[in-house]
Each structure stands twice: as structure tokens, then as C-alpha cells.
């Protein structure tokens, strides 16, 4: 994997530096969340089995291996050519951060589950409220998709594909597509 990932969240030292540089204070709750996320451990096999149970699908092997080794993060190159446009990839979600965190796979599944096709799971945040999705069921297991929230269905989106674009057939190819 040529793309490197920066750990999600911030250390206390990083928060202190950010506060000095920006001359603004983090709210106590945000500070606590960022520190908890920063210190989230890599998942165990049992934790990933539990995640699979919660999402109702087996994780594609390549994604499971990514979580075991990296567990989400901010990619070193965060731009992606998709179709005729360049898109932003903010970060990939984590499986072991507090469930209430915006960086949590399960938090995002709970929020968005009915807004994209049921074969997909959300694995990352993209620019402007869009998502990076991964196929966990069907004939394109392991495929990476870009979900555009601005074009979503006005009713149940669990079978709606008009705002979902396949960007890569595999996670490793998706990582190779990311650039500065």
C-alpha cells in the first residue's frame, strides 16, 4: 500500500499546538473525543467479528486486513479522480473509536444505512458530506464506491444507485488512485 494514513484524532500535544496556533480553544467534549480517537487501539479479530455481526455482512478480506493493520485514518494523498471530476477523501473510519464519534464505522452506518444501497457499507468521509462506500455483498464484493449525498433518493435509498459511482474494483486499487 503506497498510501500512508495519519492516525485519526489528535494527541494532547497536537491539540495544545493547534490552540496556540489558532488562538482558539477546543471545547472540553471535543478535546476528549479527539484524544480518545487518537488512542483507539487496532481491532482484535473478535472485535471485527462483532462489527460484521452489527453490519450484517462479512467484511471483504482486503478491508478486514486494512482495519487490522491501520484501522482508518487520513490518507497521505486525499484527492481522487472519479468520472470527470476530482474528489476529496477526508478520512477512513475506524472500528474501535467510541461509537458516538464521527470517526466510527458503526456511528456512520447508523446515520446513513437507509440512504445508500444495502449491499454497501460506509468506510470513509468524502468532501462536502459525501461518503466512501465498500461493497460487502453481491457481485462486486470489495468494490469501492463514491456516494453523493446531494443526489440521494427522496424515499428509502437502500435500493437506489443513481447517486453511487463505482470508483475502483478493490481497496488496494482505490488507495493507489489517491494523490496529492
Specify the residue positions occupied by each region the protein language model found:
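Compact, glycine/acidic-enriched structural inserts
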Residues: 150-173
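A short, amphipathic alpha-helical segment
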Residues: 172-180
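Short, intrinsically disordered/low-complexity patches at protein termini
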Residues: 83-85, 146, 156-158
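Structured loops at beta-to-helix junctions and adjacent beta-edge loops in soluble globular domains
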Residues: 124-126, 137, 147-150
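Low-complexity, glycine/alanine/valine/leucine- and proline-rich hydrophobic stretches
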Residues: 132-138
